[in-house]
């Protein structure tokens, strides 16, 4: 393995890789075509790493033995294409970090639910007295944790972009929450390319490892039939009985792994809704595998607080509940949000469309949505999808304008739901920025 690493991208992944590479004696150069945030520049200066931003100096980059590409950079980017033509190894931060850690990993991926499951697994492990570190696609990068923290387990949320650049990395326990069309712009608009990317989480697993997945998801089950995994399969379902895995019977979650049984009433789960029952099943299987006490699992499931920007109740004003679901960046996530609404809803949506098809939402929108507020630069697809079934549709260009409009259109007992079904990069930095702006606008009403 060469000792000269070039890191492309100066965000969380890039900085974590720089710290870890430096610690392991690499000659490190970091290059970002955009602007590096000041807080990251401080870290680079502190650990004495050479860097550049707002440009790529090719002579320095092509001198690398290995290149770490941040997940935001597509494989088709001209720089990546050139590197591969020159035979220079290009890996992801997840792959690079795994070279320097023997600590077992619980890896969680999926189109939706992965952040909730990651947080829930971490909550269960902590309550169960297990020393685990959580990161990956949320919080600290895997590389930074490997460099700076000592744990017995890592709990990692993994995006398809992070999985695209792996070679040998494997989690001991892999969870695939579901697969619905998402990020298709990065996968030649082919769903099978995106599914293949998600399944990379299991491709290096052996018979000693575990693969937890949603048996109700046709995209997953069809793929598994044609592309079997080597690991031990633990499915979960809310539709059918599962012998070795998890299912629901008489309003109870039932988990059976190697003849050990765990049950819990769904009514006691802190997070309600069908999708959260699935999240709970996935996380409770991990707890069973790690032999956490059953009583601890039950108590932890009941006390879990949920995730910011995911169906987060913000405030009630004039008996109207404002709900922040900014993390819903695709249609499937928004489907779950609308499904869980129990009263008339003013729905704020829009942003960067990732090849969305809105057909699945039509029955729910017809039943529950009284007004739609578009928040995005281009709302044409939304207007044509829902214009015939929702009487009131308004286009806005800022969060404060959208929230004020929602305030005007809502009546006592209604919900105002921000669940955009789109990415956030047209008007906001990211979905967190979008969610924070929503909460601020609600508090300013």
Curated annotation (Swiss-Prot):
GO terms for biological process: cell division; cell wall organization; peptidoglycan biosynthetic process; regulation of cell shape. Transmembrane segments: none annotated. Keywords: ATP-binding, Cell cycle, Cell division, Cell shape, Cell wall biogenesis/degradation, Cytoplasm, Ligase, Nucleotide-binding, Peptidoglycan synthesis. It catalyses: UDP-N-acetyl-alpha-D-muramoyl-L-alanine + D-glutamate + ATP = UDP-N-acetyl-alpha-D-muramoyl-L-alanyl-D-glutamate + ADP + phosphate + H(+). ATP binds at residues 110-116. GO terms for molecular function: ATP binding; UDP-N-acetylmuramoylalanine-D-glutamate ligase activity. The keyword Nucleotide-binding applies. Pathway: Cell wall biogenesis; peptidoglycan biosynthesis. GO terms for cellular component: cytoplasm. Belongs to the MurCDEF family. This is UDP-N-acetylmuramoylalanine--D-glutamate ligase. It comes from Christiangramia forsetii (strain DSM 17595 / CGMCC 1.15422 / KT0803) (Gramella forsetii).
């Amino acid at each position: 393995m060469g000792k000269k690493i070039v890191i492309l991208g100066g965000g969380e992944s890039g900085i974590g890789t720089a710290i870890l590479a430096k610690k392991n004696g690499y000659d490190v150069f970091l290059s970002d075509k955009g602007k590096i945030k000041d807080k990251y520049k401080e870290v680079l200066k502190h650990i004495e790493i050479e860097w550049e931003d707002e440009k790529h100096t090719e002579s320095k980059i092509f001198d690398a033995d290995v290149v770490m590409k941040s997940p935001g950079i597509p494989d088709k980017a001209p720089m990546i294409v050139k590197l591969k033509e020159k035979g220079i190894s290009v890996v992801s931060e997840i792959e690079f970090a795994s070279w320097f850690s023997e600590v077992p990993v619980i890896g969680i991926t999926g189109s939706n639910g992965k952040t909730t499951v990651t947080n829930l697994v971490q909550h269960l492990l902590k309550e169960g007295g297990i020393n685990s570190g959580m990161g990956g696609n949320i919080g600290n990068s895997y590389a930074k944790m490997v460099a700076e923290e000592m744990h017995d387990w890592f709990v990692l949320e993994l995006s398809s972009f992070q999985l695209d650049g792996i070679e040998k990395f494997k989690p001991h326990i892999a969870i695939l929450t579901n697969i619905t069309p998402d990020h298709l712009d990065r996968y030649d608009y082919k769903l099978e390319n995106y599914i293949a990317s998600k399944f990379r989480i299991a491709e290096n697993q052996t018979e000693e490892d575990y693969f937890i997945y949603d048996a109700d998801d046709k995209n997953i089950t069809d793929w598994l039939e044609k592309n079997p995994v080597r690991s031990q399969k633990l499915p979960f379902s809310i539709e059918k009985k599962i012998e070795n895995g998890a299912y629901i019977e008489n309003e109870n979650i039932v988990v059976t792994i190697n003849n050990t049984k765990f049950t819990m009433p769904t009514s006691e789960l802190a997070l309600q809704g069908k999708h959260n029952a699935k999240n709970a099943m996935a996380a409770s299987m991990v707890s069973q595998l790690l032999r956490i006490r059953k009583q601890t699992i039950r108590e932890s499931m009941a006390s879990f607080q949920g995730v910011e920007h995911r169906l987060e109740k913000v405030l009630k004003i004039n008996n109207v509940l404002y709900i922040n679901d900014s993390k819903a960046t695709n249609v499937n996530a928004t489907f779950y949000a609308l499904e869980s609404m129990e009263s008339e809803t003013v729905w704020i949506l829009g942003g960067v469309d990732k090849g969305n098809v809105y057909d699945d939402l039509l029955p729910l929108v017809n039943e529950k949505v009284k007004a739609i507020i578009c928040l995005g630069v281009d709302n044409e697809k939304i207007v044509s999808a829902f214009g015939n079934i929702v009487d009131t549709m308004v286009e806005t260009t800022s969060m404060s304008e959208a929230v004020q409009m929602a305030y005007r259109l809502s009546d006592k007992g209604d919900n105002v739901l921000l669940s955009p079904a789109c990415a956030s990069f047209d008007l906001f930095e990211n979905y967190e920025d979008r969610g924070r702006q929503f909460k601020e606008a609600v508090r300013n009403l």
